[in-house]
Every structure is written in structure tokens, then in C-alpha cells.
């Protein structure tokens, strides 16, 4: 019984692989260019202190943190 289920599963996966499923169009992985534009680097963060090379204040989106 188990070998029949295994054979059926193998045949189904060969005929319809999981990679054939369409991905959702609004996933960030589908649009790496937009994801890169939305990403703000630490040097461009408004709390980044260029002299000390760290972030002052809140360290939620900025790294390294001055502490």
C-alpha cells in the first residue's frame, strides 16, 4: 500500500512539479529592483552621524548603533 502511494506521489510530482505553480505578482522576491530602491542604507539614514560612523538616537532601521 505504501509503495503504491509513493509511486503515485512520484508520478504526480513528475507530471506537475511544484515549480510550475505561478508565484504571486506582488511578492518582493519577484521584484528585486523595487526591493533595492525601498531599502535605505545606514549612511543615508537621517540619524546616521558621519563623523562617528554610527547612528544616534533610535537604532531600529540604522546600523551600527552609537549606543
UniProtKB/Swiss-Prot annotation:
Transmembrane segments: none annotated. The modification 4-hydroxyproline is found at residue 64. The keyword Transferase does not apply. Pfam families: Conotoxin (PF02950). It is found in: Secreted. Keywords: Amidation, Disulfide bond, Hydroxylation, Neurotoxin, Pyrrolidone carboxylic acid, Secreted, Signal, Toxin. GO terms for cellular component: extracellular region. GO terms for molecular function: ion channel inhibitor activity; toxin activity. It comes from the Eukaryota. Residues 21-52 form a propeptide. Its main location: secreted. Expressed by the venom duct. Residues 1-20 form the signal peptide. The modification Cysteine amide is found at residue 66. The keyword Secreted applies. Disulfide bonds join 54-66, 55-62, 59-65. The modification Pyrrolidone carboxylic acid is found at residue 53. Belongs to the conotoxin M superfamily. The cysteine framework is III (CC-C-C-CC). Classified in the M-2 branch, since 2 residues stand between the fourth and the fifth cysteine residues. This is Conotoxin VnMMSK-02. It comes from Conus ventricosus (Mediterranean cone).
Amino acid at each position: 500500500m505504501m509503495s503504491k502511494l509513493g509511486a503515485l506521489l512520484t508520478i504526480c510530482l513528475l507530471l506537475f512539479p511544484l515549480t510550475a505553480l505561478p508565484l504571486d505578482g506582488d511578492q518582493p522576491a519577484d521584484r528585486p529592483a523595487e526591493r533595492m530602491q525601498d531599502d535605505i542604507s545606514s549612511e543615508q539614514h537621517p540619524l546616521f552621524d558621519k563623523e562617528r560612523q554610527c547612528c544616534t538616537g533610535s537604532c531600529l532601521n540604522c546600523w551600527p548603533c552609537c549606543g
